[in-house]
Structures are given as C-alpha cells and as structure tokens.
Amino acid sequence: MNERDSEQVAHSLMARGYERVSKESEADVVLLNTCSVRDMADQKALGKMGMLGRLAKERPHVVFGFLGCMAQARGGELLKGLPHVDLVVGTQKFHRVADYVEELIAKKKSWTSINAQRSTLNVQRRMENRMDDLRFSIVDIAEETGSQSTIREQQLTPRQATAFVSIMQGCNMHCTFCIVPQTRGAERSRSINEIASEVRDLVSRGVKEITLLGQIVNLYGRHEFPKVDSKSPFVQLLEAVHQVEGLKRLRFTSPHPIGFREDLIDAISHLPKLAEHVHLPLQSGSNKILKAMHRAYTAEKYVDLVRRIRRARDCIAITTDIIVGFPGETEDDYKQTRDLVEEIQFDNAFVFRYSPRRDTPAAAMTDQIEEHTKEARNQDLLRLVNESTRRAGERLVGQCVEVLCEGPSKTNPARLMGRTSTNKIVLFERDNELIGELVDIQIERANGFSLCGTPVQSSAGILSDTGRTGCGEPVSSGGHPACANGAGLEA
C-alpha cells in the first residue's frame, strides 16, 4: 500500500515538471514515505532522515519531508529532533503533497533572496543555520473526507505489466498489536465504477495484471454499499473488474479470514482471471493468542477456511503472515502455531517478531516476551516455512507454467523476472521483447525462493495464449513441454 501511495505522490510531482533522480545529492525534494507497522521501520526512517542533515546544510533550498503512517502517528514532534525537516504529511493527504512542496520551495526562494541581500560576511555560518532564524514548515495530519478516492493516478514505466489499485482506506478491526486504525483511520471505500474505470485506463496503457489494495481488502464497501444477490460489495467489485477487456490477471491483498464468506470462495472458483494465490494472514495458531490479538477467529476455523479455498481452486497457493513472541505467548502457544504451519504447508510465510507499537493495547500488556525468545521462535519457524517453500517450488520442476514477465531481475539484470499465477518468482534468459508479456516457461530447477527456466518455443512463438494454471503442465516424454494442453482457464 505504501508503494501505491508513493506512486501517487511521484505522479503529482512529475505532472508539475519534476523528474526522478537516482541520487539524493541531486534532488530538490526528498520525501520519505513511512511505515509504522513495526518499530524497526520507524527507526530506519528516522535514521535515514538524520543522515540527510548534512545534505540539508550543503543544500538549504532542498525540501525534506516525512509522509505516511509514521508522519500520521507522530505529527509535529518529528520536527523537534530533525530541524531540517520541512514537511510532515499524514495518510489522508498524499494528494496535497505537491501543493505543499511548491509552497515550501517558494518560501525558501524568498528567504534565500532576502538572505542574499544581508551582509556577505559569515556566509558559512548562514548556510549552517539554514532557516533557523525564519523556519518554514508544514504539518498536515488532519482527516479529509473523500481521501480514499484521491489515490487514483499512476505514472507507468514503458512495458509495465502490473499495477496496484487502491480500493479503500482505513481499518475498523482494531487488532491489539496494530497501529493501522490510528494511522489510516476508519474504513472508507471508493465506488465500483470509479475503480473499474481506473482499471480500464491502466489496461488500455498496457497493464495486464491488477492487484486490488486495501487494509482488509475483502471487507471493501461493507458500510457504504448493499449486497446484491447475496454477494458482498467486494465480490461485486471482483466481478466488475474481471469483465475489463484485456485484463489477464487479478489479485487482491490483504484479506482477513472473517471476510472470507461463501460468495468469495465461489468467486475464486469461477472467475478465471483471479490469480491462483491467496495471502491469508494467520498471525498465530493458538486460540488464546488469537483472542488476545482480537482476531475474531479460531485456529480451527482458519484451517477449515484454507481447506475450502483449496477445494475451490486446484493448485491455489496459500501464503500468510505470522507473529511470534506476542505478549503471553508460552512455549505451548508457540508449538500450536508451529504445528498448524506444518499441517497447512504454506507456499510461503512472512514471519515477524512481535514489535510493541505505542498506544496499542498489546504494548500495555504486562507479560511481554524476552527478545531472545522471540528471535529463537522466529528462526525456528522460518526454517520450517523455508522447507515448505522449497517443496512448493520443487513440485514445479519439469512443468510448463505461464509467467507474466515484469522486467530485469534486480539481483541479476542479465535475466528476466516474472511471476506465475501462484505468485512464484521465475527467472529466465533475458529477451527484452518478453517484458510485459505472458510467457510459457519450462521450469528446470528450484533455487530457494525462486525458480529458473527457459521460454518455450512453439510454432506461434514464445508468448503464452493457452491460459494454463500456475501449477503447470507436465513435460511430454519427448522432452517438449506439453504446453498446448492448458487447464482450460481463460488468460
């Protein structure tokens, strides 16, 4: 979600003539879009901005700012220890950033002009003091009606294949460990027509895969829009977006288990453009801890939900989030989580050590867990998850899978990177003509969290039009992938 917010800010600045630069030392505006889910993210952002203090002394005309969740949570206090910070903008004001930047730049130019008319003596001291004698700053963390509809513009790169679409803002769940309801506000949803229009525009510009974003995406519209034919607003949205001509894949993240009703499971089974991947946060396998977290489901209900999702779609990948070391988590509680992870065999999981967030109920709980215990549980669970991930990848070796090529690999630019419908990363030989296209890839080996393969050559070329599933098709006895016989799903 932060990535999508950053795209919106970048688009608004570029629309006014600004350009991206690769080095902070070349910038006229430096903005850090922040996350507050874990304390480490806060500390990283504060440390980064602190390091930029030297640049601020060298280039006093530059605008420095904090955006996003940490800005929302801390507001004006961020100015106290970081005198070079000019701008603090919360989560409902991203669309105001360009205006604020222009206002600050104008004030700085005026200040520079006045300062230049002063005595030319002691220039270095004046540079170091920067604007201490007349400081300009803007802090805006107020709520704004309709802010959910302001994240709607995107600056696409050439041959960009994927895009995020924000469908809602805020969260009403109030999990005891989470600061998001404080930083993102209450649930607010965009209209189906508005979202579908944005998707149509993106697809017309070459995008083939859309990911719908929301804090709890499957609770979209529950306060604004009615059910129709027993279908929730979220399922109605999925069906509307699914109808967009030219769209090849549709994803959504992140859902909450309590929002997975039968209508959504049915949609997974009958909407072929929906990717064969569900990210379903678990958080804990202990009912005691789930209750303390205010998660509103039990481990048993979670397992049953996973089974129903898997029955609805062959080869669907399930990934999850897990927190270890939540206050009061005993060894037995942790063992219950470990046992459940082993039972479900997730395709992948993000495992986090519990991080207290200020002003959350969990942070005030007295039975906090020692850091060394959190770390031991984190490492133990990661080993288990990594083994499950490895097996999931190895099952695809020798198979032919459809991959959406996103571009050069970040770790090896000589190769291209794409994703299967099941969200597996696949690396293959670079051919720039494949960027932004669906390609049939024969998987040759699994390498940790990624797969390696070779594009399949056929009489029609190497682009995919079979609509195969992410679980692949077998290689024929003659050594050629049996790619002509897909699973019958539309691309």
Annotate the PLM regions.
Residues H174, C178-G185, R249-I258, S284-R295, ...:
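Conserved strand-turn element in the central/C-terminal portion of the radical SAM core barrel
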Residues S110-S137, K227, Q457-A487:
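Intrinsically disordered, low-complexity terminal tails and inter-domain linkers enriched
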Residues C175, I195, L212, F252, ...:
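Conserved, mostly hydrophobic/aromatic
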Residues V235, Q243-V244, R249, R261-T320:
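Radical SAM/AdoMet-radical enzyme domain recognition
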Residues T157-A161, C171-M173, L274, S284, ...:
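Short flexible coil/turn linkers enriched for glycine and charged/polar residues
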Residues E329, E343-F346:
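Contiguous mid-protein beta-loop-alpha structural module that forms a pocket-lining wall or clamp
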Residues A364-E473, G478-A491:
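Terminal RNA-binding accessory module
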